């Protein structure tokens, strides 16, 4: 597997992975994290434009897509409740990670490669996304507290540092 920046040629594959991920989350008891059409092809294209959309490719097939931004200043991470961040150093963020195949270690690989590139990463997930919470903890992310999105929705915040 390899991680690489997404290109316009990847948009359809990434959008399909997001469609399948929304269905997977609904079936797994998490119908509220990604509502409606979010995330979608427009989000992938926006990330391509600012250099933050990535894909994981295996034998020429796009098997995962995600947003990875270095030196982020995510406004929703400025305040954290019921805990604290591990440090106040510059950080990277991972958002919108989704995979085509489950149980093959694809998310673990993506997180590992991101951490090799940047050793201070923040990420959040919905309280009902139990599979992602387990993956985050398995991959060395530590729960830090609760953050609120701009629309007021609550998320569980995690961080992994060197």
Task: Give the predicted meaning of each segment.
Residues 2-16:
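A short beta-loop-alpha structural element at the N-terminal edge
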Residues 23-42:
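Conserved GNAT-fold acetyl-CoA-binding loop/helix
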Residues 42-55, 72-75:
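A short helix-loop-beta-strand connector motif used in the catalytic cores of GNAT acetyltransferases and
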Residues 50-68:
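Conserved beta-hairpin
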Residues 67-102:
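Conserved acyl-donor/pantetheine-binding loop and adjacent beta-alpha core of acyl/acetyltransferases
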Residues 99-116, 134-138:
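Conserved acetyl-CoA-binding loop-helix of GNAT-fold acetyltransferases
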Residues 116-128:
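Conserved GNAT acetyl-CoA-binding A-motif
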Residues 124, 142-156:
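Conserved catalytic-core motifs of GNAT/GCN5-like acyltransferases
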């Amino acid at each position: 597997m390899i991680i690489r920046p997404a290109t316009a040629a990847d948009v359809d594959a990434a959008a399909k992975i997001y469609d399948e991920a929304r269905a997977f989350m609904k079936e797994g008891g998490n119908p509220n994290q990604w509502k409606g059409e979010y995330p979608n092809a427009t989000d992938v294209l926006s990330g391509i434009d600012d250099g933050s959309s990535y894909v994981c490719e295996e034998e020429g097939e796009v098997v995962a897509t995600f947003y990875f931004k270095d030196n982020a200043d995510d406004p929703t991470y400025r305040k954290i409740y019921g805990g604290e961040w591990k440090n106040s150093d510059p950080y990277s963020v991972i958002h919108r990670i989704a995979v085509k195949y489950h149980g093959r270690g694809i998310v673990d690989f993506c997180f590992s490669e991101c951490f090799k590139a940047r050793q201070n990463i923040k990420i959040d997930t919905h309280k009902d996304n139990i599979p992602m919470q387990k993956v985050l903890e398995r991959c060395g992310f530590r729960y830090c507290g609760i953050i609120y999105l701009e629309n007021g929705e609550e998320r569980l915040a995690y961080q992994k540092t060197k």
